[in-house]
């Protein structure tokens, strides 16, 4: 019976939402409707094996957990974890069916919450960057992001060119006088020197630009399968956030190669576990990176849904060769 339901589930339309956008809001709406009417979604029965009476019992449990959650789930992963915890003693087929109905990750596809940022610097780290909030346009692809660090940071202030500092002062005075033409010209000079004025907490902050290449992973290029998904996942994690970057070295393109932490999440871990990057073993042999890639391979998530996905370094080599 369980196999028949799972087969039927593949043939039917879902709740009409995507895991990346509408699943959480659809669940929220249905919980609100259940609280008012005690009715479960009509089409849910096509995805689960239990009766409507049992389904109503699930929604009572999920609704209670939803109300107690602080903050409320915002991502598909958070919503999935809440449902799984609320229905931990129920049939696996029912839980997976309910998650499938909303387009939420199933238990075997659920990415574990990454580890917190290390208290002490790992071996090989040369310095640490603490960035200003990341802009939407700063994410180039799934493994490269541009960040800015305030000139008040000791690491930046110790090497701040005098002409850049002076240009920032002159720009502020020009803006006070509403001479925006001069202010814009001065800002172009600042930008050409590798700095920028960033609006932060109701003030203009002089900040230095750093291009960051995530250490140990290689995501699909933008024109490759899953290139857009990798870009979008990285953007979703870092957009508007202040990051901690542990820098190991500089690559031949002048980028800082390092680990990125965002709200305690290790960004490379998320990208690997979601199947949106390869472990770049040629440049980083950390065992945990290989482990996270292998977990994604076994679950066949992301790019590992393909039996033999093209490696980005081979794709780049072929492009350079004119193939």
Curated annotation (Swiss-Prot):
GO cellular component, one term: plasma membrane
Class of the enzyme per the UniProt entry, highest EC level: hydrolase
Lipidation (S-palmitoyl cysteine): 11
Activity-regulation annotation: Inhibited by Zn(2+).
Record-annotated disulphide pairs: none
Pfam families in alphabetical order: SNase
Enzyme Commission number(s) of this protein: 3.1.31.-
Note on how the cofactor is bound: Binds 1 Ca(2+) ion per subunit.
Membrane-topology annotation of the record: Lipid-anchor
Family, as annotated: Belongs to the thermonuclease family.
Name of protein: Staphylococcal-like nuclease CAN1
UniProt source species: Arabidopsis thaliana
């Amino acid at each position: 019976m369980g196999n028949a339901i799972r087969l039927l589930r593949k043939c039917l339309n879902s709740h009409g939402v995507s895991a990346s956008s509408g699943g959480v809001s659809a669940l929220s709406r249905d919980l609100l409707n259940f609280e008012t009417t005690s009715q479960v979604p009509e089409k849910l029965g096509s995805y689960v094996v239990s009766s409507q009476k049992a389904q109503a019992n699930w929604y009572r449990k999920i609704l209670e957990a939803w109300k107690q959650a602080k903050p409320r789930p915002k991502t598909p992963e958070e919503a999935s974890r809440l449902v799984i915890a609320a229905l931990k003693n129920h049939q696996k087929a029912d839980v997976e069916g309910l998650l499938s109905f909303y387009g939420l990750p199933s238990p075997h596809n659920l990415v574990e919450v990454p580890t917190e940022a290390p208290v002490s610097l790992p071996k090989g780290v040369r310095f640490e960057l603490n960035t200003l909030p990341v802009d939407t346009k700063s994410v180039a692809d799934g493994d490269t992001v541009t960040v800015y660090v305030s000139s008040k940071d000791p690491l930046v202030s110790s090497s701040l060119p005098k002409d850049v500092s002076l240009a920032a002062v002159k720009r502020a005075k020009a803006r006070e006088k509403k001479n925006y033409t001069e202010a814009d010209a001065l800002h172009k000079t600042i930008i050409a020197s590798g700095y920028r004025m960033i609006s932060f907490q109701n003030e203009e902050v002089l900040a230095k630009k750093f291009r960051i290449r995530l250490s140990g992973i290689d995501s699909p290029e933008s024109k490759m399968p899953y290139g857009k998904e990798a870009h979008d996942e990285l953007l979703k994690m870092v957009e508007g956030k202040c990051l901690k970057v542990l820098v190991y070295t500089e690559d031949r393109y002048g980028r800082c190669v390092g680990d990125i932490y965002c709200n305690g999440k290790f960004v490379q871990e998320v990208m690997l576990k979601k199947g949106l990057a390869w472990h770049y073993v040629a440049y980083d042999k950390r065992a945990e990176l290989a482990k996270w890639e292998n977990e994604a391979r076994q679950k066949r998530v992301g790019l590992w849904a393909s039996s033999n996905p093209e490696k980005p370094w081979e794709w780049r080599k072929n492009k350079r060769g004119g193939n």
